[in-house]
Amino acid sequence: MKISVGLYGTNAHQIALAMIQGFNKHYTLFRQTSREAKTRFEQADWLGVHKAVKERIRFYDDRVDECVERLRNQFDAASIDDTTWQQVKLLYIGLLLNHKQPELAETFFNSVTTKILHRNYFHNDFIFVRPSISTENIEGDDTQTYRSYYAKEDGLRGTVLKIVKDFDWHRPFVDLEHDVEHVYHAVRHFLNGMPPREVNFQIQVLGSAFYRNKAAYIIGKAINGATEYPFTIPVLQNEAGQLYLDTILLDAWRIGLLFSLSRAYFMVDMEVPSGYVQFLRSILPAKPRSELYIMLGLGKQGKTMFFRDLIYHLHHSEDKFIMAPGIRGLVMLVFTLPSYPYVFKLIKDVFGSSKEMDRATVKKKFMMVKQVDRVGRMADTLEFSNVMFPLKRFNDEVLAELQQLAPSCFEVDGDQLIIKHLYIERRMEPLNIHLDRMERANNVERLEHVIREYGSAIREMAQANIFPGDMLWKNFGVTRFGRVVFYDYDEIEYMTDIKFRQIPPAPDFETEMSGEVWYAVSRNDVFPEEFATFLLTSPQVRKIFIKYHKDLLSPRFWLEAQEKIRSGYVEDFFPYPQELRFINRQTDLTEEQ
């Protein structure tokens, strides 16, 4: 259908205008809070940072609901006929021709229409199953996606100075020239000497800093001949309010870890988000675009792109969904597609007898994880509703488990299986399986690494105000980089809501030996001394854990962590090794000079 001039001014045109106005309002608010991240960083308003991240998550759904309500009240959305809806989509496309965020606006259109239309309309005639507007080479009106620098006149040191100063932070640096010297020597060491500069030598830097927690990140790449060198420079602030360059990350894989879904989302002021994603993809080609959008705070766009990728993969693969390996959970039913690196989780209709909660509580726990700082220790999830899969792609075991444990969560419509509510997250090897493999292989070095990681995960979550609740090995996974991450959320609580207690002495020897509890226990009481009994049954594992994390087995650590959180203290979490920090490399600089 071609767009007719006669459609302008019609009901369809007014509906399309209402929808683009709804999106524009959303993105204006999104950019405003992202822009304010610079001020929060300068003012060291760390509690404000966490508050802003939590509030921003609600922005999208609030604007979608607002737009749906407007269409229902102003246009009687339920009575709009099919022809008009098709015209609305075509007119909406016309409104996106010169838009700076067309891909986000298309996703907003989908979010609104799928709340109004039946799923039979979820195809490209009515919604954007495929994108309609190219996002290639969109230029901003007010800002550049990236800035280019040439070291011919100022030299490399002078150019790095200019790059940092161009971010215009309203805080003094402790000693910027000294930090730049560190940058220079770190680069020279990484490259085993400075290569000759080609005629096209330049440094490209994304125009907005990336703000998260207590850090600002400068992200860019150097181009020399046919070679590109990605880099990231974290900028931190000391207690005196002075800034300093903490390190420079030069390995692409290490930069990629900054964008891990187990970490909090960035705040970035982007006029053209597709330009930022395109730049990031040039330095992180293995990172899916969907994950980059998510980490930029654009979760709905990330979900849209993820699902398009999944459907595309299903069209080009033949394997079937199977039950995920590992011990079956009491709350979640989990399956996976072997050829795709994700797991799919449903909330069961009936939980195990030891679980005292309902479906609504579980959903709140998953939302809680999105709103907190995951500090690289909690897997992010993508939440979907009414997802259609080819029925033939499920093996008999998965279908039987669905029918037995979650019959209200799915339905079959012809050759499609529709799952009403679903969480999707990155697949990891369950820690209990990994430990068993390492013990059987007598791989002591690897065993020590993951047990140390396990304790560090618990410690860092606690410092970020999260108590995992069920700390059994099966509730943690091991990433492909060897990092231990928590992924079972039905029992998590805020640290500040837990009462950590020491087990009181038994009144007599007989009582102590009886195996019965001799003290009163309330719902949120936790006794850290009991952890070893349930978790450290293997002598080898127990020895390693106590070597690194003995303090986690006493109330003192937990009470001190609570006290810090309640006082408003925000812990420092570094998404890179301590040995890379310039403060720990002073001798390297002295030796090179």
Swiss-Prot record:
Keyword Lipoprotein included in the entry's annotation: no
Q: Which domain of life is it from?
A: Bacteria
| Residues engaged in binding ATP | 324-330, 345
GO terms of molecular function: [isocitrate dehydrogenase (NADP+)] kinase activity; AMP binding; ATP binding; phosphoprotein phosphatase activity; protein serine/threonine kinase activity
Q: Name one GO biological process term.
A: glyoxylate cycle
Mind telling me which InterPro entries this protein's record contains?
Answer: AceK_kinase, AceK_regulatory, Isocitrate_DH_AceK
What is the recorded name of this protein? Isocitrate dehydrogenase kinase/phosphatase
Q: Which Pfam family, any one, appears in the UniProt record?
A: AceK_regulatory
- Function of the molecule: Bifunctional enzyme which can phosphorylate or dephosphorylate isocitrate dehydrogenase (IDH) on a specific serine residue. This is a regulatory mechanism which enables bacteria to bypass the Krebs cycle via the glyoxylate shunt in response to the source of carbon. When bacteria are grown on glucose, IDH is fully active and unphosphorylated, but when grown on acetate or ethanol, the activity of IDH declines drastically concomitant with its phosphorylation.
Against NCBIfam families, the record matches this protein to: PRK02946.1
Q: Which key words are in the record?
A: ATP-binding, Cytoplasm, Glyoxylate bypass, Hydrolase, Kinase, Nucleotide-binding, Protein phosphatase, Serine/threonine-protein kinase, Transferase, Tricarboxylic acid cycle
